[in-house]
């Protein structure tokens, strides 16, 4: 995992549902915690593009449902600003399933991937077909 230059808005709190855009068998996942989040008392942990989260699989194949896994967020609807002044937002909130070390579990990623996620997680960047 590498550091990223831009400060991404943390728009996805615990409980948010995301589309799973890889070929692991999970279709929809729910965030149950954010890795490395240091917050304030009674504040819900929130995540943004490029963050690793712990998710529960809500929809998918029978053997994947109700599994607790790690995922990396690759798209979010809430816009965020890059250091060059460009504002980026996507059509949906999406994540890909990864191992605890950050290695992609699937072999393909559907749709575009944010540059911040691809730079921070090399295995996600190498599997992405489109990097925005």
Curated annotation (Swiss-Prot):
User: Which spans of this chain does the record mark as coiled coil?
Assistant: none
InterPro entries, alphabetically?
Ribosomal_uL14, Ribosomal_uL14_arc, Ribosomal_uL14_CS, Ribosomal_uL14_sf
The answer to whether keyword Aminoacyl-tRNA synthetase applies is no
**Pfam families named among the record's database cross-references:** Ribosomal_L14 (PF00238)
Q: Which UniProt keywords apply?
A: Ribonucleoprotein, Ribosomal protein, RNA-binding, rRNA-binding
Q: Name one GO cellular component term.
A: cytosolic large ribosomal subunit
> In Gene Ontology terms, what is a biological process of this protein?
translation
Molecular function terms from GO: large ribosomal subunit rRNA binding; structural constituent of ribosome
Q: Does the keyword RNA-binding apply?
A: yes
Q: Which domain of life is it from?
A: Archaea
Q: How does it assemble?
A: Part of the 50S ribosomal subunit. Forms a cluster with proteins L3 and L24e, part of which may contact the 16S rRNA in 2 intersubunit bridges.
Explain the purpose of this protein.
Binds to 23S rRNA. Forms part of two intersubunit bridges in the 70S ribosome.
Family to which this protein belongs: Belongs to the universal ribosomal protein uL14 family.
Q: What is the name attached to this protein's record?
A: Large ribosomal subunit protein uL14
Q: Which organism is it from?
A: Methanothermobacter thermautotrophicus (strain ATCC 29096 / DSM 1053 / JCM 10044 / NBRC 100330 / Delta H) (Methanobacterium thermoautotrophicum)
Q: Which gene encodes it?
A: rpl14
């Amino acid at each position: 995992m590498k550091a990223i230059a831009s400060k991404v808005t943390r728009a996805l709190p615990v409980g948010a549902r995301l589309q799973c855009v890889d070929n692991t068998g999970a279709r929809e996942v729910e965030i149950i915690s954010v890795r490395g989040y240091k917050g304030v008392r009674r504040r819900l942990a929130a995540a943004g593009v490029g963050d690793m989260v712990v998710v529960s699989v809500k929809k998918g194949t029978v053997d994947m449902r109700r599994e607790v896994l790690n995922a990396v967020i690759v798209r979010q609807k809430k816009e965020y600003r890059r250091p060059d002044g460009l504002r980026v937002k996507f059509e949906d909130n999406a994540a890909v399933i990864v191992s605890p070390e950050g290695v992609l579990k699937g072999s393909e990623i559907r749709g575009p991937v944010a540059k911040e996620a691809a730079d921070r997680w090399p295995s996600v960047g190498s599997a992405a077909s489109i990097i925005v």
